[in-house]
Amino acid sequence: MDIPKDRFYTKTHEWALPEGDTVLVGITDYAQDALGDVVYVELPEVGRVVEKGEAVAVVESVKTASDIYAPVAGEIVEVNLALEKTPELVNQDPYGEGWIFRLKPRDMGDLDELLDAEGYQEVLESEA
């Protein structure tokens, strides 16, 4: 299971990658593998203000649908429109082309409350 060390993670299997004053968000390799083949992604609206832990998107697979939660509070500033035509990018490249949304955090310091790669690995091991 791939867990890049350059980003933060949540216990609900989202990742958050700081880029300047924004944060790119997607789901982890573990999450996409558990979901199976992704067939649709319901993207949030740009401009929407969200709270940490709020359900902001939905990923639907052949097996199930799963809410995607905001890792920190902030404003959605961009969504990955490529997922409308090719939702399978979430499976093929969960840490790259399969990102879901970008938000501008209310406070970048909130990222410190998230897990690092080692902490996320421990979560996965406790769920196994």
Curated annotation (Swiss-Prot):
One of its GO terms (cellular component) is glycine cleavage complex. The modification N6-lipoyllysine is found at K63. Residues 22-104 form the Lipoyl-binding domain. GO terms for biological process: glycine decarboxylation via glycine cleavage system. Keywords: Lipoyl. Binds 1 lipoyl cofactor covalently. Gene3D superfamilies: 2.40.50.100. Its cofactor is (R)-lipoate. It comes from the Bacteria. Belongs to the GcvH family. PANTHER family: GLYCINE CLEAVAGE SYSTEM H PROTEIN, GLYCINE CLEAVAGE SYSTEM H PROTEIN-RELATED. The glycine cleavage system catalyzes the degradation of glycine. The H protein shuttles the methylamine group of glycine from the P protein to the T protein. The glycine cleavage system is composed of four proteins: P, T, L and H. This is Glycine cleavage system H protein. The lineage of its organism: Bacteria, Thermotogati, Deinococcota, Deinococci, Thermales.
